[in-house]
Regions:
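Short, surface-exposed connector motifs at secondary-structure boundaries
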Residues: 135-137, 206-210, 289-291, 308-315, ...
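Glycine-rich, N-terminal phosphate-binding loop and its surrounding beta-alpha-beta segment
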Residues: 40-48, 53-112
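General beta-strand structural signal in soluble alpha/beta enzymes
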Residues: 85, 139-143, 167-172, 238-241, ...
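Rossmann-fold NAD(P)-binding glycine/threonine-rich loop
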Residues: 298-347
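Glycine-rich phosphate/diphosphate-binding loop of Rossmann-like nucleotide-binding domains
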Residues: 176, 181-288
């Protein structure tokens, strides 16, 4: 990942967009910062009986379209500027797709691999204890994001109901079906990215059945994108992921992968590093692959100026939020490489 500040990135994009649309400068002033950002300290009793304090955030960018809406991520790199930027992207996504929501985003600075299941539950409930006055189905509606899932949403909703007496299940989305969740929610983003990829290739005169695709990130979005692209006939030849012990790694198979088998292996082992019959390549080689599409589905700022100059793909589809930074975007435009933006691709 590049060190380019994500808030600075989205502000540059907003500034340029306002200039292109010839909007009054006050529009940019309204959008460049969230309406509020809440920073909290969450005390959690660990399994050893000692307390540990975790830093958390919730950014509420703009509610002109409706209640704030956006995920909560658990990751060691979470910070205030990141959640501010992500909440701005959520405002743009909801507006672009005509959804009656504004933009929100939250997160906790934590490595979930270091916590037991009980500690993770106490942390999730603690986040709600500190923030419950600022959320609700008509005000701010959290959802899953990086390293959070339907189980964590269920814990959070349960805690919210205990604290408020308000049993409206719509306060949190992304829950299990038995707890007020929606059919297809888990796969929805990946399906959308896959459809956008197929249709974009079609515009370029490329049949998806003859395409080669590389995906960065194999979490919920990346794995479901791969699964549905394979069903459409796409050939996934490379996947880049992160392993706590190995760091960033990339697997490659010029003949393509069996995605169902990859998903099963990843769910069982939480890594693809040791997957059978693959070639390991560097992340630099990943960006330089002779493929038709690169789909970044990891974290923001994955593609900077250096990566943009190496890319040989004809198309980049932003499965993650803000994976191509402002400067890289200009380079790709000059090189006639099409970027399908996150506010459309993963909305």
């Amino acid at each position: 990942m590049n060190s380019f500040n994500p808030l600075e990135n989205v502000q540059k994009i907003l500034k340029k967009s306002c200039e292109i649309l010839n909007l009054d400068e006050s529009v940019y002033d309204l959008l460049k910062e969230p309406e509020r950002t809440i920073e909290i300290n969450i005390p959690v009793k660990m399994d050893n009986g000692k307390f540990r304090i975790f830093k958390g955030f919730r950014s509420q960018h703009c509610d002109v379209m409706g209640p704030y809406k956006g995920g909560i991520r658990f990751h060691p790199t979470v910070n205030g500027d990141e959640v501010k930027a992500l909440s701005a992207w959520m405002s743009l996504k909801c507006s672009a797709t005509h959804l009656p929501f504004g933009g929100g985003k939250g997160g906790i600075i934590v490595d979930v691999n270091e916590l037991s299941d009980n500690e993770l539950e106490r942390l999730s409930r603690g986040y709600v204890k500190e923030l419950y006055k600022y959320i609700g189905d008509r005000y701010d509606i959290p959802a899953p994001d990086v390293n959070t899932n339907e189980k964590i949403m269920a814990w959070m909703l349960d805690e919210y109901i205990k604290l408020t007496g308000n049993n409206t299940l719509a306060t949190f989305t992304g829950k299990a079906l038995g707890f007020g969740g929606s059919y297809g929610r888990k796969e929805a983003t990946g399906v959308g990215v896959a459809v956008i990829t197929r249709e974009s290739l079609k515009k370029l005169g490329i049949n998806i059945r003859e395409s080669k695709i590389a995906i960065q990130g194999f979490g919920n979005v990346g794995s479901n994108t791969a699964k549905h692209l394979e069903r459409m006939g796409g050939n996934i030849v490379s996947i880049s992921e992160y392993d706590k012990e190995k760091g960033v790694y990339t697997i490659y198979n010029e003949d393509g992968f069996n995605i169902a088998d990859l998903i099963a292996h990843f769910e069982k082992n939480n890594t693809l590093f040791d997957y059978k019959d693959v070639k390991h390549i560097s992340i630099d080689q990943f960006y330089s692959l002779d493929v038709d599409v690169i789909i970044p589905c990891a974290l923001e700022n994955s593609i900077g100026e250096e990566e943009a100059n190496k890319i040989r793909a004809k198309l980049i589809v932003e499965g993650a939020n803000g994976p191509v930074n402002y400067y890289a975007d200009s380079i790709l435009k000059d090189r006639n490489i099409i970027v399908i933006p996150d506010i459309l691709a993963n909305s």
